[in-house]
Curated annotation (Swiss-Prot):
Protein task: Component of the exocyst complex involved in the docking of exocytic vesicles with fusion sites on the plasma membrane. In adipocytes, plays a crucial role in targeting SLC2A4 vesicle to the plasma membrane in response to insulin, perhaps directing the vesicle to the precise site of fusion. It is required for neuron survival and plays an essential role in cortical development.
PANTHER family, alphabetized: EXOCYST COMPLEX COMPONENT 7, EXOCYST COMPLEX PROTEIN EXO70
Entry's free-text remark on domains: The C-terminus is required for translocation to the plasma membrane.
Name of the protein this chain belongs to: Exocyst complex component 7
SUPFAM superfamilies per the UniProt record, alphabetical: Cullin repeat-like
GO MF, one example: phosphatidylinositol-4,5-bisphosphate binding
Membrane disposition: Peripheral membrane protein
Chief location: cytoplasm
Modified-residue entries (Phosphoserine), positions: S133
Length: 653
């Protein structure tokens, strides 16, 4: 049981807590009442604000919509005014631009094209909106006048600034390709940069708005004339240079043989030099055409529309190309006439030209890509013509060597080298510079097709066979000509000189190697022929040495007195030798052996034989009393006989 005091204390404690809780509850109740009151007040305020906001919205939105409508109306008015201004401006275009169009585009192309753009727009406007308006006719007329002025300006710019390329610059352009050292590229400025830009702008305008291609015809006509005159100027430059300072350097004909004559004996002063100049000039003109045509195409690409470039370029190069082809055909025609005259040295002008044309053909083909077939076929046609005429020249030359009719009146009286031999060798030597070309000519006739499809070895063998044929024909002709001489010894000297000249000429040049391709024993064969003729010549001395040859001498007993018959025989032997020696020396002194080595060899051999025979004869009979006047019969000492033989083949002795 809890004590009364403790229970009383706990009751008071509980009562205190209860009181506190009641106070707290009362505070909370008051707070809730205040909160409710505040909430009611806030709801009332918000309701009032919402009501006012709705009133404001109901009054502002109509105003806003009205304002938007007003702004839209204002914009429409402004656009309408702008359109009206724009339309009205079309009616003023003619008057605003007439002065500029009348004065032309020279010096103010930018402004002029701007005016033309305005006129173009005016034309389009009136055509779409007022096709019956008189203003349309005005602006159309003004547009046509402006277009004509632009076309005229295009022509004027091209005419004024398209200059002929100087020959020196063209030569630099050509030679730049052949220089081994690195050099700056040779740049051709066909038109000043500012002019070029104007021309490009005009051409583009004419293509886009002018609907006219006449300016392309103007372009190719002007540039074609310039190209043609540039090439003709180069040709004229060669002619003038040749008359004053010799033939200009030619990259197309390098390393001309200085020790090899290139022509027959000159009949007309300067004629052969002129042929060289014409040939060199033509070769340079061909190279110039390729380089200038390449440059022209680069220029054309910036001015002419792409789909018209090939056709315009084809037209542009025609005059210059036709000029080259015509000149080439004239060369072929001249060669054909020269063949008829048997002037084969003139025909040789075809060889360097043909070689250069074939070397240049790949570049030619590249330049002419896209041109008409007739244009592309011009060079191959000329090459074929030259191959054909060249092959005919070679064939006729070989036949002419075999059938040369000249005999008596044209035979050298001293037995020296015949003109036919020297000309034949010179002709063959010149072929060395054009081995591939000549071989291709022969191959083209052998196969009836282009020789380019055959290797160089095939052509080389054909050329070797041809040279052997010419040499064989020459040998037959020389044998025939040698029969004109009544003296077999002179005939032998003639053949010896010609055979020796042929052999030496073959050895000095590459001809001997070329001949050896198909005839390995040619050199040995010529040496045998030469030796045979020397032996034939030496037999002419038998009529002299037979008088004193030991086998023909009678035997005398020493100390026995000679009979009259024996003395007379000795006298006849001395006299026969003396007369024969004098006669041969007199005759053969006028003969010629141009080769010093051969001349000395023949003299020495003959001198050795005669001196030995005469010395033995003289030794045997000089002390024999066969005459009272020994000086009458013993006219020469052995040394004198040798001296006389040393003067053979020497008219100055």
């Amino acid at each position: 049981m809890i004590p009364p005091q403790e229970a009383s204390a706990r009751r008071r404690e509980i009562e205190d807590k209860l009181k506190q809780e009641e106070e707290t509850l009362s505070f909370i109740r008051d707070s809730l009442e205040k909160s409710d009151q505040l909430t009611k007040n806030m709801v009332s305020i918000l309701s009032s604000f919402e009501s006012r906001l709705m009133k404001l919205e109901n009054s502002i939105i109509p105003v806003h919509k009205q304002t938007e409508n007003l702004q839209r109306l204002q914009e429409n008015v402004e656009k309408t005014l702008s359109c009206l201004d724009h339309v009205i401006s079309y009616y003023h275009v003619a008057s605003d631009t007439e002065k500029i169009i009348r004065e032309g585009p020279t010096g103010r192309l930018e402004e002029y094209l701007g005016s033309m753009a305005k006129i173009q727009k005016a034309v389009e406007y009136f055509q779409d909106n007022s096709p019956d308006s008189p203003e349309l006719n005005k602006v159309k007329l003004l547009f046509e006048r402006g277009k004509e002025s632009l076309e005229s300006e295009f022509r004027s710019l091209m005419t004024r600034h398209s200059k002929v390329i100087s020959p020196v610059l063209v030569l630099d352009l050509i030679s730049a390709d052949d220089e081994l050292e690195v050099q700056e590229d040779v740049v051709l400025e066909h038109l000043p940069e500012s002019v070029l830009q104007d021309v490009i702008r005009i051409s583009r305008w004419l293509v886009e708005y002018g609907r006219n291609q006449d300016f392309m015809n103007v372009y190719y006509q002007i540039r074609s004339s310039q190209l043609d005159r540039s090439i003709k100027g180069l040709k004229e430059h060669f002619r003038k240079s040749s008359s004053s300072s010799g033939v200009p350097y030619s990259p197309a004909i390098p390393n001309k043989r200085k020790d090899t004559p290139t022509k027959k004996p000159i009949k007309r002063p300067g004629r052969d030099d002129m042929l060289d100049v014409e040939t060199d000039a033509y070769i340079h003109c061909v190279s110039a055409f390729v380089r200038l045509a390449q440059s022209e195409y680069q220029l054309l690409m910036g001015i002419i529309p792409e789909h018209h470039q090939k056709k315009t370029f084809d037209s542009l190069i025609q005059d210059a190309l036709d000029g080259l082809m015509l000149e080439g055909e004239n060369i072929v025609s001249a060669a054909r006439k020269a063949i008829i005259r048997h002037d084969f040295s003139t025909v040789l002008t075809v060889f360097p030209i043909l070689r250069h044309l074939k070397q240049t053909k790949p570049e030619f083909d590249q330049v002419l890509q896209g041109t008409a077939a007739s244009t592309k076929n011009k060079l191959p046609g000329l090459i074929t013509s030259m191959e054909t005429i060249g092959a005919k020249a070679l064939e006729d030359f070989a036949d002419n060597i075999k059938n040369d009719p000249d005999k008596e009146y044209n035979m050298p009286k001293d037995g020296t080298v015949h003109e036919l031999t020297s000309n034949a060798i010179l002709f063959l030597q010149q072929l060395l510079d054009f081995q591939e070309t000549a071989g291709a000519m022969l191959a083209s006739q052998e196969t009836s097709s282009s020789a380019t499809s055959y290797n160089s070895e095939f052509s080389k063998r054909l050329l070797s066979t041809y040279i052997c044929k010419v040499l064989g024909n020459l040998q037959l002709n020389l044998l025939s000509k040698s029969k004109v001489y009544e003296d077999p010894a002179l005939s032998a000297i003639f053949l010896h000189n010609n055979y020796n000249y042929i052999l030496k000429s073959l050895e000095k040049s590459e001809l001997i190697q070329l001949v050896a391709v198909t005839q390995k024993t040619a050199e040995r064969s010529y040496r045998e022929h030469i030796e045979q003729q020397i032996q034939t010549y030496q037999r002419s001395w038998l009529k002299v040495t037979d008088y004193i040859a030991e086998k023909n001498l009678p035997v005398f007993q020493p100390g026995v007195k000679l009979r009259d018959k024996e003395r007379q025989m000795i006298k006849e032997r001395f006299k026969g030798f003396n007369d024969g020696l004098e006669e041969l020396c007199k005759i053969q002194k006028a003969w010629a052996i141009p080769d010093t080595e051969q001349r000395d060899k023949i003299r020495q051999a003959q001198k050795s034989i005669v001196k030995e025979t005469y010395g033995a004869f003289l030794h045997r009979y000089s002390s024999v009393p066969f005459t009272k006047n020994p000086e009458k019969y013993i006219k020469y000492r052995v040394e004198q006989v040798g001296d006389m033989i040393d003067r053979l083949f020497d008219t100055s002795a």
